[in-house]
Amino acid sequence: MSPSSDVFAAWLASLEAKHLRELTFREVSRSLRALSATYVERRHTLVDGAALSGRGKRAAFALFYGPLHHLLVAHIVRELPSALDRVPTLVDLGCGTGAAGAAWAAAVTPPPRIVGLDIHPWAVREAAETYRTFGLVATTEQRDIATVTFPKGRAAILAAFALNELTDMAREPLLARLAERAAHGDRVLVIEPLAGGVARWWNRWRDAIERAGGRADEWRIRVELPAIVAKLNRAAGLHHREITGRSLFL
């Protein structure tokens, strides 16, 4: 399992204790199957918050997808040149449980202050706990990331598995805004699932990022899954043998 730090293990243990306190493992695994179906077959419902509707789906998201996102981002930022450069602030757009933002921030020395933003109140609370567990200084706020006001000064901006949950009308203006921030010295990292049909806007964004001097990558990494993730993986019949994603970095 990587990263193999005590804090990562403690975070996983706290997630398991919290989310299995009032739900059985069977209930969570059943909710994970439903959540996976939402991502694969009913992605149009994501803009309405379908992924986090109900305790079961929220627990499944936190226990399964959160650790996977953390491991993926931790790997990506180690591979991207300048991703680990010192920066005062990390803006975690659509922070979810904070797993992805914590992975990037924890890899930087010294860790930046995190600003976690999400439209879902449960996600904001969950992210605050995640950042705190990793010993990161952070503020969280319930905000629509499509209309976010970026902080003054240099920052790293992360949008991990978040932009595809916006409508096209809400998403498109962000491209120019993120490119402008990068032109003034910010680091911008966008991550989405690898499946080609998931983000139909991806190729257009990729071309724009590459024209601006950025890069696009696809990732397939094999790691030992954390025990709770592996157990849910088997129980829900998802057969995750590797962690995958694609990224844009500017």
Which sequence ranges carry the predicted segments?
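N-terminal auxiliary segments of SAM/dcSAM-dependent transferases
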Residues: 1-48
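Class I SAM-dependent methyltransferase Rossmann-like catalytic core
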Residues: 47-76
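Conserved SAM-binding loop of SAM-dependent methyltransferases across substrates and taxa
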Residues: 97-110
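Conserved SAM/SAH-binding beta-strand->alpha-helix loop
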Residues: 120
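A short SAM/SAH-binding and catalytic strip from SAM-dependent methyltransferases
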Residues: 155-169
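A short glycine-rich, Lys/Arg-flanked "PGG" loop and its adjoining helix->strand segment in the class I
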Residues: 172-184
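Conserved beta-strand signature within the Rossmann-like core of class I S-adenosyl-L-methionine
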Residues: 184-193
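Class I S-adenosyl-L-methionine
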Residues: 212-250
